[in-house]
Amino acid sequence: MSAPRTLYDKIWDDHLVDEQADGTCLLYIDRHLVHEVTSPQAFEGLRMTGRKVRAPEKTLAVVDHNVPTSPDRHLGIKNEESRIQVEALATNAAEFGVEYYSASDKRQGIVHIVGPEQGFTLPGMTIVCGDSHTSTHGAFGALAHGIGTSEVEHVLATQTLIQKKAKNMLVRVDGQLPPHVTAKDIILAIIGEIGTAGGTGHVIEFAGEAIRALSMEGRMTVCNMTIEGGARAGLIAPDEKTFEYIKGKPRAPKGEALEQAIAYWKTLQTDEGAHYDRVVVLDAASLPPIVSWGSSPEDVISVQGIVPNPDDIPDETKRTSKWRALDYMGLKPGTKMTDITLDRVFIGSCTNGRIEDLREVAKVVEGKTVAPTVDAMIVPGSGLVKEQAEAEGLDKIFKAAGFDWREPGCSMCLAMNDDRLKPGERCASTSNRNFEGRQGFKGRTHLVSPAMAAAAAIAGHFVDIREWN
């Protein structure tokens, strides 16, 4: 009888082509997502060596990082470097026979929102993209992670990837979440617990009652930020919620093929007694709404907390780092999080730019008005999310409250397009990274859930969403 295996073990074994004595493996790749930033050199490498894309039907190209989200984006991209990258992707996709969603295609959006929407992402698959937040697709029980540009070229040419197997890590979130505490709070709490290096060298499987209770979109939020916890990939075993989400998606299996697929997907569960190299357990009932205070995703605290004092940290290197973070963020130890005022609010990104996120925001802001001191924007994660939100009338609620309702794209998650912070501006953001300069030169980013961001936009400062009227 074979040894019990984890979900990661099973997907790995199903895709292992070859293994060398030193542990170097060749892994088959089922799906390859491509965007404009990390692919130009990869396609050029194919061109220079006379190679083709081995499996264009398993490759999907989407523009997201550089595209403007302003209503006039049909007039073109002003920044020359951004325009060149977008044009290169269109040219490369056409030349190499890869399906491509341009900025004028309603299926366009952030690549990690588009993949699941289209049924391109399926359980048990290996999925890669030249983007660190590829871990998002792990919500479907797929082994998904980011790769570098040279690896993008390798996958395009061979549909395989060379790598060594990671260790297994389990993060279990037991119990039920309190009202108004979300998937975003779960993953921020996990990163706060394990640190940004806590998952290094591991693939994390998320499990427990609180994880199972999440919708597919909530699970995508959790898996999206696995990389911020240091792990290469995050996984959640598929279940009936997964199967229901997939049914009817454009690229998903249909009819008998779907039934056969579901029969296989049901085997994608960790066996009883399987070994994890590390186990972390959190109590869902104890989790509050969370806000980041520093310049790392591990710098998190309850919205009811105060900015911590780095002098309380024994390790000198870490202590120095946290003082630097406070200096950058313009904060002093002991400041109440609810006393921190804001200049900007950004709701969107591959972490929280889906329809359920926007519905939560609408509940918070309906009938209210954005604070006069705040500039707030909502960026749907894809053209289909935008279409759905407008069909439900959410855009009218947002506009009436004073939010800027934008076109789909990565937007202010990162300073690679026109949406960015000015030096010194403080932003409540539903994105995934609060590094120095991430949203703009000397911009100050606080990571929060969509509902928390929405409430902060109305109040002009952080508020506890549990006390929101």
From Swiss-Prot:
It comes from the Bacteria. Transmembrane segments: none annotated. It catalyses: (2R,3S)-3-isopropylmalate = (2S)-2-isopropylmalate. Its EC number is 4.2.1.33. Its cofactor is [4Fe-4S] cluster. Binds 1 [4Fe-4S] cluster per subunit. InterPro entries: 3-IsopropMal_deHydase_lsu, Acnase/IPM_dHydase_lsu_aba_1/3, Acoase/IPM_deHydtase_lsu_aba, Aconitase_4Fe-4S_BS, Aconitase_4Fe-4S_dom, IPM_dehydratase_rel_enz, IPMI_cat. [4Fe-4S] cluster binds at C350, C410, C413. It is an enzyme of class 4 (lyase). GO terms for molecular function: 3-isopropylmalate dehydratase activity; 4 iron, 4 sulfur cluster binding; metal ion binding. GO terms for biological process: L-leucine biosynthetic process. SUPFAM superfamilies: Aconitase iron-sulfur domain (SSF53732). Pathway: Amino-acid biosynthesis; L-leucine biosynthesis; L-leucine from 3-methyl-2-oxobutanoate: step 2/4. Keywords: 4Fe-4S, Amino-acid biosynthesis, Branched-chain amino acid biosynthesis, Iron, Iron-sulfur, Leucine biosynthesis, Lyase, Metal-binding. The keyword Transit peptide does not apply. Heterodimer of LeuC and LeuD. Catalyzes the isomerization between 2-isopropylmalate and 3-isopropylmalate, via the formation of 2-isopropylmaleate. Belongs to the aconitase/IPM isomerase family. LeuC type 1 subfamily. PANTHER family: 3-ISOPROPYLMALATE DEHYDRATASE, HOMOACONITASE, MITOCHONDRIAL-RELATED. This is 3-isopropylmalate dehydratase large subunit. The lineage of its organism: Bacteria, Pseudomonadati, Pseudomonadota, Alphaproteobacteria, Hyphomicrobiales. The gene is leuC.
